[in-house]
Amino acid sequence: MWDNHQALNQVADWLFTLAGLTTIYLMVQWTIHLPLLPLKEVHIRSNSGSGELRHVTREQVSDVVHREVGGNFLTIDLEAARHTFEKLAWVRVASVRRIWPNGLDVVVEEHVPLAHWGDSALVNRQGEIFNATSDEPMPIFEGPRESVREMVHQHAVFTKLLQPLKQDVEQVELSPRRAWRVRLGNGTILELGREHLEKRLERYVQTHDLVVARLNQRLSYVDLRYVSGFAARGTR
């Protein structure tokens, strides 16, 4: 082989190519790990029209970046960073992209709360439970966790049916036996049972004023689980 000049030239070319590729690889690795490419700026905005955030603070984002987002501009794992931002209490969905030469652009969709769920969680408009608290006046949902989307739907139905009376839904309860109970903003409790919910609530709305006039007092409790009527109790 050592007398074969053609073979020696091929080996030399191969070694030269390997050395060149190794050098390029090492230079790339050295370059991307340079301290000259640290992440210095994180631009965060809402995906809403205004771009303003309602619940997520820039301090929270900065803290997350310093504690959990590793790497520099070139080495950062954008998918891992996205998951990290989505751990923030009010972030429903996040997207992350690089901004040359040392920044990140983070766009978040914040949860829009619809109701309280227990003492330390909320329900958003998509029927998802997330761990956050709010002082905003909202209805309270109580029921099986797996039924939360159904409760969001029924809350919308109840709210629409009660519009003629201008009565608000303050609490929606769904028992383990799937019986529904609604408490209104004026304190009235409506027992709706497990079936014919809309029909029963429509009956309440249609006869409310007549029943209140006869009793001459506000209703405190209404049992709508009867076939063709309901039982009502006044505040006195």
Curated annotation (Swiss-Prot):
One of its GO terms (biological process) is cell septum assembly. One of its GO terms (cellular component) is cell division site. Pfam families: FtsQ_DivIB_C, POTRA_1. Residues 1-14 are cytoplasmic. The keyword Magnesium does not apply. Residues 38-236 are periplasmic. This is Cell division protein FtsQ.
